[in-house]
């Protein structure tokens, strides 16, 4: 079968297009691979630099604490050979008098300033210490709350449930904070707890409520009118004087009890 010129041209263009497209895809993959490799190398270099910086930081801290700026070793004393010569000469000069006077004794160095520590650098050259090199404060800052570990160590066991139940008005506070001094805590412990005593200890809670025990015959009409005139205020405002001077309510099946304030602790908590 003989292909026509048009078919041959079409197949050639089709194959060339896909070949060129494949070459472009391969080139893009190769470029992305090179980019990732370069990025990995750069990250490794940065990691090595960070590790070196972390390794050198303790040395810098030691240098700054010794008095020299970090990163720079204390310079050697200048003209060391020149300084050694007079020292040896001076020692040779003093050999003969020591031999005449008695046994050899350790001779003090005549020039102690030669071996003295280097002077601390000026303030504008010194670098402030790192945050972790600051000395720990002996006393905690009173304006800030303690951390979790200190709070756990300072916390006291909770009080027994029975002791909480005996609290009359929910004023139980047994918290000794570290911010209070020992004197204040001792004074608070010496003071007795306040006693809340309900009134009318000789009577029960039902003594203030005058409920009808048994049905009684209704009062006549004039008595009803007088009783209505006496108690026109359905919700009277009770005071101490009224409580002392007011007579107890009359019992009767026809009248609802008037609410009287109860003193002391109620059952509703």
From Swiss-Prot:
UniProt topological domain (Extracellular) ranges: 1-9
Modified residues (Phosphoserine): 64
Span of the annotated motif PDZ-binding: 267-269
Record InterPro entries: WW_domain-binding
Species of origin: Rattus norvegicus (Rat)
Record lineage: Eukaryota, Metazoa, Chordata, Craniata, Vertebrata
Subcellular location as annotated: Cell membrane; Postsynaptic cell membrane; Postsynaptic density membrane; Cytoplasm, Perinuclear region
GO molecular function: long-chain fatty acid binding; protein tyrosine kinase binding; protein-containing complex binding; ubiquitin-like protein ligase binding
Residue ranges of the region described as Required for interaction with NMDA receptors: 1-44
Region of interest (Required for membrane localization), ranges: 2-39
Domain of life: Eukaryota
Tissue specificity as recorded in UniProt: Expressed in brain. Expressed in the cerebral cortex and especially in hippocampal neural cells (at protein level).
Region of interest (Required for apoptosis induction), ranges: 146-269
UniProt feature, compositional bias: Basic residues: 108-117
Subunit structure: Forms a complex with NMDA receptor zeta subunit GRIN1 and epsilon subunit GRIN2B. Interacts with GRIN2B. Interacts with GRIN1; the interaction is reduced upon NMDA receptor activity. Found in a postsynaptic membrane complex with DLG4 and GRIN1. Interacts with DLG4 (via PDZ3 domain and to lesser degree via PDZ2 domain). Interacts with FBXW7. Found in a complex with JUN and FBXW7. Interacts with JUN and FBXW7; the interaction inhibits ubiquitination-mediated JUN degradation promoting its phosphorylation and transcriptional activity. Interacts with SRC.
Keywords, comma-separated and alphabetical: Adaptive immunity, Cell membrane, Cell projection, Cytoplasm, Immunity, Lipoprotein, Membrane, Nucleus, Palmitate, Phosphoprotein, Postsynaptic cell membrane, Signal-anchor, Synapse, Transmembrane, Transmembrane helix
Protein name as catalogued: Proline-rich protein 7
Annotated gene: Prr7
Biased segments, Pro residues type: 118-128
């Amino acid at each position: 079968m003989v292909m026509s010129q048009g078919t041959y041209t079409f197949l050639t263009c089709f194959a060339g297009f896909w070949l060129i497209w494949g070459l472009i895809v391969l080139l893009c993959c190769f470029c992305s691979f090179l980019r990732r490799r370069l990025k990995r190398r750069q990250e490794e270099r940065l990691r090595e630099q960070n590790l070196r910086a972390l390794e050198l930081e303790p040395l810098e801290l030691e240098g700054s604490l010794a008095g020299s700026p970090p990163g720079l070793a204390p310079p050697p004393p200048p003209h060391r050979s020149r300084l050694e010569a007079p020292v040896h000469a001076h020692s040779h000069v003093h050999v003969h008098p020591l031999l005449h006077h008695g046994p050899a004794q350790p001779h003090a160095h005549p020039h102690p300033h030669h071996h003295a520590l280097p002077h601390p650098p000026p303030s504008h050259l010194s670098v402030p210490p790192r945050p972790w090199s600051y000395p720990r404060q002996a006393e905690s800052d009173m304006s800030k709350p303690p951390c979790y570990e200190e709070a756990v160590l300072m916390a006291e066991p909770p009080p027994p449930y029975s002791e909480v139940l005996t609290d009359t008005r929910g004023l139980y506070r047994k918290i000794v904070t570290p911010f209070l001094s020992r004197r204040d805590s001792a004074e608070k412990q010496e003071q007795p707890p306040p006693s809340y005593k309900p009134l009318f200890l000789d009577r029960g809670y039902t003594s203030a409520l005058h409920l009808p025990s048994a049905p009684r015959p209704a009062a006549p009409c004039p008595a009803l009118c007088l009783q209505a005139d006496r108690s026109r205020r359905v919700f009277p405002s009770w005071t101490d004087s009224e409580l002392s001077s007011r007579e107890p309510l009359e019992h009767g099946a026809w009248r609802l009890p008037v609410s009287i304030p109860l003193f002391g602790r109620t059952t509703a908590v």
